[in-house]
């Protein structure tokens, strides 16, 4: 589970990732923007949400990268993911990794249908 709560007006916001540890206990950790910034550095300051800017782009890329582990796929889909989700979030939000994976799978299916239509 990923979640965020606005803590300041403007500026970077923390995003939290809740995972189940090897012993079954839930652990909450901060999502690090650095891996996504190494792919595309939209926002050197970090994450934001609720509008269509650079901070939300960084968050969309980071979420996709963290969930899928696929840098190419994450780069290709992050702007659409931002527009569909991140830009619409209010003061607080939460999203399960499974929801993100379902969205990715749906996008990949839709893209496959489009390319099949072009080939015919």
Where are these regions (language model features)?
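Long, low-hydrophobicity ectodomains and other hydrophilic envelope-associated domains
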Residues: 1-16
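Short, compact, well-ordered microdomains
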Residues: 67-111
């Amino acid at each position: 589970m990923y979640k965020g709560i606005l803590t300041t007006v403007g500026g970077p916001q923390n995003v939290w990732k809740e995972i189940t540890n090897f012993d079954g206990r839930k652990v909450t950790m901060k999502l690090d923007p650095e891996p996504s910034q190494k792919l595309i550095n939209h926002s050197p300051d970090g994450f934001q949400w609720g509008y269509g800017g650079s901070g939300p782009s960084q968050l969309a890329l980071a979420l996709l990268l963290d969930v899928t582990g696929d840098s190419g796929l994450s780069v290709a889909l992050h702007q659409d993911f931002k527009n569909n989700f991140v830009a619409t979030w209010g003061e607080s939000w939460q999203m399960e990794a499974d929801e993100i994976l379902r969205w990715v799978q749906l996008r990949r299916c839709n893209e496959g249908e489009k390319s099949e239509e072009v080939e015919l």
